[in-house]
C-alpha cells in the first residue's frame, strides 16, 4: 500500500495556474500533490556566443529551491557562493528537455530562459519543473507571436516528465517524498506527447533491479506522462 493510498499507476493531483506572475512572458505555478514549482519563461533578443549569426535560437533553464521548501531550512546557494552539483544536473536536464519541444531554427536569434523555483518540495521537483516549464515556454512563444516577433509559434510538441520507482517491491508512478526516500529504485522519465523518450535517469538505491522491472516502470511513466500532457493542453486551452 502506498502512503498516499494511490494505485501504482496513479499520479498525484495536479493543479496548473497560468499567468501566475505579472512580468514574465510565460509564468506557471504547477502543483503536483504537495510539490509546488514556479516556472517563469523570459524572452531575450540575444543568444549565446556560439549561436550568434547563425539564425538559430536557444532555450535554457535555471533551477533553485527556496530555503524552506523542505522540512528543514537549507542555506541559499547564493550564500554558499556556488551552485551545487545536484542543482547543475537538474537545470541541465530541464533545459535539454525543453529544447526538444521547440524548433530552434524557427525561433530565430532569440533565447528563452525558464527559471524553475521550488516553493515546496515533496518529491518529483525536477519532473514538475519540466512539466510546468513547458507550459510557461508555450506561453512565452505565444507572447512572441502576439508581439510580432515571430510569425507562428515554433513549439513542436509538449514535453512532460514523471518519476517512477519501485516501492516495497512494486513499481509505482509519481513518487512523493515518503515513497522516494524509501524506494528501492528511483527513476525520472522525460517524454514527448507522441511517446518519444528524451531522457531516462534510473538508479538502484537498494540492490539491482531487473530488466522486467525497468520495462514496467517505463510503461507506468508512459501512462503518467500521457495524463500530464492532457492536463498541459487543458491548461493552455483554458482561455
Swiss-Prot record:
One Gene Ontology term of the molecular function aspect: tRNA nucleotidyltransferase activity
Keywords from the named record: Nucleotidyltransferase, RNA-binding, rRNA processing, Transferase, tRNA processing, tRNA-binding
GO terms, biological process: rRNA catabolic process; rRNA processing; tRNA processing
Positions with a binding annotation for phosphate: 86, 124-126
Catalyzed reactions per annotation: tRNA(n+1) + phosphate = tRNA(n) + a ribonucleoside 5'-diphosphate
UniProt entry tagged with the keyword Nucleotide-binding: no
Superkingdom as given in the UniProt entry: Bacteria
InterPro entries xrefs: ExoRNase_PH_dom1, ExoRNase_PH_dom2, ExoRNase_PH_dom2_sf, PNPase/RNase_PH_dom_sf, Ribosomal_Su5_D2-typ_SF, RNase_PH, RNase_PH_bac-type, RNase_PH_CS
EC number: 2.7.7.56
A Pfam family: RNase_PH_C
Cystine pairings recorded for this chain: none
Its biological purpose: Phosphorolytic 3'-5' exoribonuclease that plays an important role in tRNA 3'-end maturation. Removes nucleotide residues following the 3'-CCA terminus of tRNAs; can also add nucleotides to the ends of RNA molecules by using nucleoside diphosphates as substrates, but this may not be physiologically important. Probably plays a role in initiation of 16S rRNA degradation (leading to ribosome degradation) during starvation.
HAMAP family in the cross-refs: RNase_PH
Quaternary structure annotation from Swiss-Prot or TrEMBL: Homohexameric ring arranged as a trimer of dimers.
Record family assignment: Belongs to the RNase PH family.
Full protein name: Ribonuclease PH
Organism (species): Psychromonas ingrahamii (strain DSM 17664 / CCUG 51855 / 37)
Amino acid at each position: 500500500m502506498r502512503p498516499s493510498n494511490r494505485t501504482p499507476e496513479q499520479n498525484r493531483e495536479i493543479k496548473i495556474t497560468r499567468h501566475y506572475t505579472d512580468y514574465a512572458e510565460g509564468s506557471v505555478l504547477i502543483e503536483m500533490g504537495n510539490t509546488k514549482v514556479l516556472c517563469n519563461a523570459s524572452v531575450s533578443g540575444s543568444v549565446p556566443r556560439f549561436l550568434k549569426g547563425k539564425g538559430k535560437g536557444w532555450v535554457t533553464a535555471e533551477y533553485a529551491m527556496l530555503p524552506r521548501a523542505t522540512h528543514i531550512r537549507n542555506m541559499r546557494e547564493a550564500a554558499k557562493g556556488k551552485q551545487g552539483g545536484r542543482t547543475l544536473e537538474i537545470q541541465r536536464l530541464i533545459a535539454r528537455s525543453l529544447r526538444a519541444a521547440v524548433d530552434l531554427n524557427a525561433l530565430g536569434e532569440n533565447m528563452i530562459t525558464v527559471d524553475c523555483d521550488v516553493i515546496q518540495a515533496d518529491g518529483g521537483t525536477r519532473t514538475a519543473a519540466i512539466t510546468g516549464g513547458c507550459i510557461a515556454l508555450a506561453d512565452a512563444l505565444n507572447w512572441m507571436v502576439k508581439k510580432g516577433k515571430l510569425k507562428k509559434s515554433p513549439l513542436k510538441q509538449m514535453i512532460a516528465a514523471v518519476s517512477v520507482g519501485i516501492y516495497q517491491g512494486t513499481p509505482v508512478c509519481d513518487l512523493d517524498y515518503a515513497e522516494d526516500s524509501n524506494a528501492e529504485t528511483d527513476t525520472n522519465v522525460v517524454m514527448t506527447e507522441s511517446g518519444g523518450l528524451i531522457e531516462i535517469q534510473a538508479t538502484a538505491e537498494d540492490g539491482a533491479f531487473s530488466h522486467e522491472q525497468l520495462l514496467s516502470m517505463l510503461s507506468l511513466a508512459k501512462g503518467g506522462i500521457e495524463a500530464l500532457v492532457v492536463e498541459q493542453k487543458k491548461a493552455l486551452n483554458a482561455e
